Amino acid sequence: YTSCGVTGSAVGMDKIIMKAVFQSMGLPVLASTFCHRSEWQEDPAAVTARAEALGYPVYVKPANLGSSIGISRAVDRASFEQAMAIACAYDRRILIEKGLEKPVEINCACLGFGGKATPSLCEQPVSWEAFLSFDQKYMRGGGKGMENLARKIPAPIPDAMTRQIQDYTVEIFKMLECKGVVRVDYMIDPQTDALYVCEINTIPGSFAFYLFEPMGISFRQLVDQLVEYAHEALVQKNESTFAYDSEILTKMMNGTKSIKK
């Protein structure tokens, strides 16, 4: 298969674990807390206190969903309570993340396998206000997908910032043992120019091909490369041994057979 294996896919599906991994790598992430649905049901005041310690606005996100489903922006206690009700309807674990005022979103994809990782150009989506909803991502322009969204490629940011984002993207790609194409999303605080890693998408819309095209990699070439990496991964898997002959295990198996007789 052409996409990530178990490790990258699992981390990419869990926003709470994902953020913990990014933090452990020393990457800049937005302040956050998390809770279980049962905590909110039993002691909403305690969860609210943790959220308000971050300071509004905050984003409330189901841990295991994508495409902005169940995500809400809370600017006060009333909207936070509403956001929690929405998120809890979708998941039992909820991420509560500090929000930025009018952040600049930057995305960067990466293509590779193993030690090989090629970062794409950076893009800046420009057709959003608070964040892209599910409909904005997939229903705009006749449902043609993410490639149809308005964006600036390359992103109009300093070269040093571009290189930093590309370096982070490659670092994340390798740490999570990714394969194929992934996309890592970032935010820049326009007030401080601080950069934050947001999340990784292990199966990005349209394979983020539009981020590689300006580099001279056509969609056909991208697909060919995905197939090649998938084959390379299979070859490497077949080179590994998955069986271990053990006298102890043999005796245990023989003993089990004797008992059955």
Residue ranges of predicted features:
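Hydrophobic beta-strand scaffold residues
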Residues: 1-2, 29, 58, 219
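Short small-residue beta-strand/loop micro-motif enriched in glycine and branched aliphatics
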Residues: 3-4, 67-68, 205-210
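A short acidic/small-residue loop/turn micro-motif
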Residues: 37, 125-127, 203-205
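Short, acidic/small-residue loops that bind anionic groups at enzyme active sites
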Residues: 1-10
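ATP-dependent carboxylate activation and anion-phosphoryl transfer catalytic cores
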Residues: 23-26, 156-261
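Phosphate-binding site of ATP-dependent enzymes
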Residues: 75-152, 156-160, 167, 195
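Active-site nucleotide/adenylate-binding loops and adjacent lid/helix of ATP-dependent enzymes
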Residues: 10-97, 101-102
